[in-house]
Amino acid sequence: MNFVKSYCPALEELFRNSFKRLHRIAISCNDRLLVPQYRDGGGRISEQELKHVFIQEFLSCPTFEGWKYSIETPSVNIYKFTCGHKPLSEFKIGPDHGGRSANIDLCLYCDNKPSVLIEFKANNPGHFEHGKDFFKLENEPNDSLKYFVELYQNTDKATMKSIEEKLFINTYCKLPENVSFLGFSLYDKDLRGPAQIVVDRTTTPISIKAMKI
């Protein structure tokens, strides 16, 4: 684990570079990857675009030469998040609850061992959607780095409050200690430009803020 941890700075720089490229794509369309358009002409950017750009950056980065990756990787554990179509108030883990394997959005392998688990989200979905990914990442048994990466179309003070609640006041599952959060906003209204959403766990209470990127 200590060896893999040494890659944290390079990984987080890779996430930032991926976002910067996606931001350029969103404002200029000068890339082979196009932003899909709604009927009204507005662009629709999701976690899929960010994941795609990240994979391209990962494959071209010399630091990760020899590493491999897999998409929608089945989880080691069995999980149950819903009963019928209703979210469970308490998520279940293990084979005794009638659950099934979940999927990890992206897994990176060093020496053919799962070393980095990544979940991508976009546009601030609900507490349940966040909590489900937090629970899944927290409980996967392999000794790997774990990231929750979220893309926001735009942010303001109200959005920041909503993000904070979903990360730290989530009744389904809060952001675990063993999971790193990286958030990116294509346009922060206060900063008037793209921003990284930064979590500081060293403060009490934990602080969250937008910073220019």
What kind of feature is each model-predicted range?
Residues L151-I213:
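Domain-level recognition of nuclease-like catalytic cores that cleave nucleotide substrates
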Residues S18, L22, A26, F54-P62, ...:
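Hydrophobic, Leu/Ile/Phe/Ala-enriched alpha-helical segments that form helix-helix packing faces
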Residues L106-N124:
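Conserved catalytic cores of phosphodiester-cleaving nucleases, focusing on short active-site segments
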Residues G42-G43, G66-N112:
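Active-site metal-binding core of divalent-cation-utilizing nuclease and nuclease-like domains
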Residues M1-L59:
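Charged, often low-complexity linker/regulatory segments
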